[in-house]
């Protein structure tokens, strides 16, 4: 059974950890491990659809000697897909000011809607960065939008393995091979947009393409 996301420490500590983990010589780089949209949703504490109302640069902590800054985005939450048990209506989200610490730049005061995934810090604030799955809503496929309601959450017990080169094989029956990078040289290609890694009644997992009807073994899992 997938574990619930653990509470994340305060943002000042999180910023320091990001700075320490940044590789030497890559002062302006933000490096993230690849993850399928399904993995992002499963590993995040919350997933919401929202509009950005405004932004403001704020101190990362109350310590006057701390030079770190954060961007506080005021948002209008449209729909919550994950995180009900931890937060209700979200008014603000926070991200590092520096792009080298994976800070996210979002368009404020526009009609653009976003899918936002992120962490909930120990003080209750919502923290997002470039290693989360953050996409303009209009860029999501029909399957991705529908899967935010059901399929992604219900199949967090499946493991998705990124395939970079051949040979590339699974090591367990609950794995799905993610081949977008191998075939298209980009992460969010056709497979990320149109497939979900779904669990069968026997515990194994395989890719399900959204435009095809669900097979009985999938239905038995989703509707016991």
Swiss-Prot record:
Keyword annotations: Disulfide bond, Metal-binding, Metalloenzyme inhibitor, Metalloprotease inhibitor, Protease inhibitor, Secreted, Signal, Zinc
Pfam families registered for this protein in UniProt: TIMP
Binding sites annotated in the UniProt record for Zn(2+): 30
Subcellular location: Secreted
GO CC terms: extracellular matrix; extracellular space
Domain of life: Eukaryota
Leader sequence residues: 1-29
Residue ranges annotated for the NTR domain, each copy included: 30-156
Gene Ontology molecular function terms on file: metal ion binding; metalloendopeptidase inhibitor activity
UniProt entry tagged with the keyword Metal-binding: yes
Positions of region (Involved in metalloproteinase-binding): 30-33, 99-100
Disulfide-bond pairs as recorded: 30-102, 32-131, 42-156, 158-205, 163-168, 176-197
A Gene Ontology biological process term: negative regulation of membrane protein ectodomain proteolysis
Record site feature (Involved in metalloproteinase-binding), residues: 69
Family to which this protein belongs: Belongs to the protease inhibitor I35 (TIMP) family.
Physiological role: Complexes with metalloproteinases (such as collagenases) and irreversibly inactivates them by binding to their catalytic zinc cofactor.
Protein name according to UniProt: Metalloproteinase inhibitor 4
Protein's organism: Bos taurus
Source taxonomy: Eukaryota, Metazoa, Chordata, Craniata, Vertebrata
């Amino acid at each position: 059974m997938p574990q619930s996301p653990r509470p994340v420490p305060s943002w000042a500590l999180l910023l320091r950890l990001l700075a320490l983990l940044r590789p030497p010589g890559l002062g302006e780089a933000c490096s993230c491990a690849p993850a399928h949209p399904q993995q992002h949703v499963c590993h995040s504490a919350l997933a919401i659809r929202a509009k950005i109302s405004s932004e403001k640069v704020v101190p990362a902590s109350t310590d006057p000697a701390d030079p770190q800054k954060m961007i506080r985005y005021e948002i209008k939450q449209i729909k919550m897909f994950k995180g009900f048990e931890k937060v209700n209506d979200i008014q603000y989200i926070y991200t590092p000011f520096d792009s080298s610490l994976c800070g996210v730049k979002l368009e404020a005061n526009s009609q653009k809607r976003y899918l936002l995934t992120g962490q909930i810090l120990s003080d209750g604030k919502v923290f997002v960065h470039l290693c989360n799955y953050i996409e303009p809503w209009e860029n999501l496929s029909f399957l991705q939008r529908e899967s935010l309601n059901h399929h992604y959450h219900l199949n967090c017990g499946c493991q998705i393995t990124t395939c970079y080169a051949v040979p590339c094989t699974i090591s367990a029956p609950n794995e799905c091979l993610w081949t977008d990078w191998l075939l298209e040289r980009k992460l969010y290609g056709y497979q990320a947009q149109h497939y979900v890694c779904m669990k069968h009644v026997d515990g194994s997992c395989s890719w399900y393409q959204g435009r095809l009807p669900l097979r009985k073994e999938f239905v038995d899992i989703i509707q016991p």
